[in-house]
Amino acid sequence: MIIVHDIFICKPGNASKVAKMFKEWADVVPQKNVYVMTDMTGQFHRVVIASSFESLTAYEEGMKTMGQSEEEKKVMEKFKDMNEMYLSGSREIFKVW
């Protein structure tokens, strides 16, 4: 199993907006093990989307189909201005032992 963290460092005042958008997206994706988290300690204005997959291959397959359903496409429209809401981002992939 792997756990993936997609991390966004948001501009001040935007973390809750970004988290809300991702939460709405997480509610419509077929994968049900998606968590949207905001910082309580550490770097400020951080939003982390955490998800788990059986393998790296399963993650790659999931990325291929992301945003394909009509419901996802509708929610993804709200992301069109997201690039203006964050400063940087990164992805971390962890193997669970």
Question: PLM features: residue spans?
Answer:
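A broad, low-specificity signal marking well-ordered, structured residues that form hydrophobic/aromatic
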Residues: 4, 47, 89
